[in-house]
UniProtKB/Swiss-Prot annotation:
CDD domains: ALDH_F1AB_F2_RALDH1
Keyword ATP-binding applies: no
Role played: Can oxidize benzaldehyde, propionaldehyde and acetaldehyde. No detectable activity with retinal.
Alphabetically ordered keywords of this record: Acetylation, Cytoplasm, NAD, Oxidoreductase, Phosphoprotein
Reactions listed under catalytic activity: an aldehyde + NAD(+) + H2O = a carboxylate + NADH + 2 H(+)
Name of the protein in its database record: Aldehyde dehydrogenase, cytosolic 1
Main location: cytoplasm
């Protein structure tokens, strides 16, 4: 069976004008309390796209008050039929489809995503996430429980309340919908802080949320910096839950702030150093391509990046040769331009961090097969880089690089590679490539990771739970489990005169 044809990709919008740069509270646009603004850059050109209102604690306080008011008993949102919440989410998905070209252009310009990927993948995945959680809205059920004695007992899954949602810069639109969808499906209200590098699609989504008909205060969006706006959300005494996607370092700060404030519920999707294991019996062409995409997609700026590639000894040299050949095919440049398949890193800080880790690989004795430096004179570009002869103690084998850098290591036995793969503080994802079913089941069961792919990589269906073991986070996004992260489970027990079966 042939796979369905991909839709044609139109040209990006020319001369895109940014309409929404203010803080969104109570379905209205606000200047920041401080009157401060911050610049938003195009990482391919280093030029300022626009200036956005800089929210801080005072603005977060305003947003939380609006969200709390919208969550009051008897409010339009609390009394709304669950099916109507689902209809509103589907309406929002329809508006995203209408504005697909605008959203994709904005995501490519602001986040450095290759335009075709933004159009075909980012916007599509975001729409599907909203549609999936829209379907759940009137299917969130409690249970009746046959308890002992003349007691009638049942459970309710209730919305938690006001939820803070802190969005990363590497998937601004996708993660926005992954968090917004389940929160609203369950009946919560939200205060969203997009990453300071990439606030534009979130602010456009605010206009669509109002257009879709969500009541005022249900969704509030406060752009700003992590230590100020993000810190205010994490430590706020009237926010009931915080969900964060980003680095493990910042995740620890958020969990600490949540504990020191009101012990708010916390969901964290954090860093990774994901192993990808290729056995000698694997389909070599397929394994090379999946492993390549697993670390080079979106310039390596993905939390599940296959950044520790273990290849069985007997096929190691050939695998390295093919991987280098594949990496050399990239055409770098402005991701809005046709024919480009690698864009820039998000900002100067990330760009310099990646180049520093590449230098550490050279100094520590890894063999640089290709790339290894900056590309071009303008924009935050890094050459596609492949290292061979990498050993486990090197920094490039231990630290999250978040860039287009592939580390290829050699292994001899299954037992050996399982131990090495698990020898990390992270546990987000892993990949296994083999035609042997016994190997596939044994290794996937042994790996300490929240998502294990077998003979594929980067497949993250919205219907399935996604999240990490160990220091890669707490809780899950997506799927039924991701939905329940936005509910409190209440037991109601009432005395009755006589119980009957």
């Amino acid at each position: 069976m042939s796979s369905p044809a991909q839709p044609a990709v139109p040209a990006p919008l020319a001369n895109l004008k940014i309409q929404h740069t203010k803080i969104f509270i109570n379905n209205e646009w606000h200047d920041s309390v401080s009157s401060k603004k911050f610049p938003v850059l195009n990482p391919a050109t280093e030029e300022v796209i626009c200036h956005v209102e800089e929210g801080d604690k005072a603005d977060v306080d305003k947003a939380v008050k609006a969200a709390r008011q919208a969550f009051q008993i008897g409010s339009p949102w609390r009394t709304m039929d669950a099916s109507e919440r689902g209809r509103l989410l589907n309406k929002l998905a329809d508006l995203m489809e209408r504005d697909r070209l605008l959203l994709a252009t904005m995501e490519s310009m602001n986040a450095g995503k290759v335009f075709a990927h933004a159009y075909l993948l980012d916007v599509e995945i975001s729409i599907k996430a909203l549609q999936y959680f829209a379907g759940w809205a009137d299917k969130i059920h409690g249970q009746t429980i046959p308890s002992d004695g003349n007691i009638f007992t049942y459970t309710r899954r209730e919305p938690i309340g006001v939820c803070g949602q802190i969005i990363p810069w590497n998937g601004p639109l996708i993660i926005f919908t992954w968090k917004l969808g389940p929160a609203l499906s369950c009946g919560n209200t939200v205060v969203v802080k997009p990453a300071e590098q990439t606030p534009l699609t979130a602010l456009h989504m605010a206009s669509l949320i109002k257009e879709a008909g969500f009541p005022p205060g249900v969704v509030n969006i406060v752009p700003g910096y992590g230590p100020t706006a993000g810190g205010a959300i994490s430590s706020h005494m009237d926010i009931d839950k915080v969900s964060f996607t980003g680095s493990t370092e910042v995740g620890k700060l958020i969990k600490e702030a949540a504990g020191k404030s009101n012990l708010k519920r916390v969901t964290l999707e954090l860093g990774g150093k994901s192993p990808c294991i290729v056995f000698a019996d694997a389909d070599l062409d397929s394994a090379v391509e999946f492993a390549h995409q697993g670390v080079f997609f979106h310039q390596g700026q993905i939390c599940v990046a296959a950044s520790r590639l273990f290849v069985e000894e007997s096929i190691y040299d050939e695998f390295v040769r093919r991987s280098v050949e594949r990496a050399k095919k990239y055409i770098l440049g402005n991701p809005l331009n046709s024919g480009i398949n690698q864009g820039p890193q998000i900002d100067k800080e990330q760009h310099n961090k990646i180049l520093g880790l590449i230098e550490s690989g050279k100094k520590e004795g890894a063999k640089l097969e290709c790339g290894g430096g900056r590309w071009g004179n303008k924009g935050f570009f890094v050459q596609p880089t492949v290292f061979s002869n990498v050993t486990d103690e090197m920094r490039i084998a231990k630290e999250e690089i978040f860039g287009p850098v592939q580390q290829i290591m050699k292994f001899k036995s299954m037992d050996d590679v399982i131990k090495r793969a698990n020898n990390t503080t992270y546990g987000l994802a892993a990949g296994v490539f083999t035609k042997d079913l016994d190997k596939a089941i044994t290794v996937s069961s042994a790996l300490q990771a929240g998502m294990v792919w077998v003979n594929c990589y980067l497949a993250v269906p919205v219907q399935c739970p996604f999240g990490g073991f160990k220091m890669s986070g707490n809780g899950r996004e997506l799927g039924e489990h991701g939905l329940y992260e936005y509910t409190e489970l209440k037991t109601v027990a009432m005395q009755i005169s006589q119980k009957n079966s």
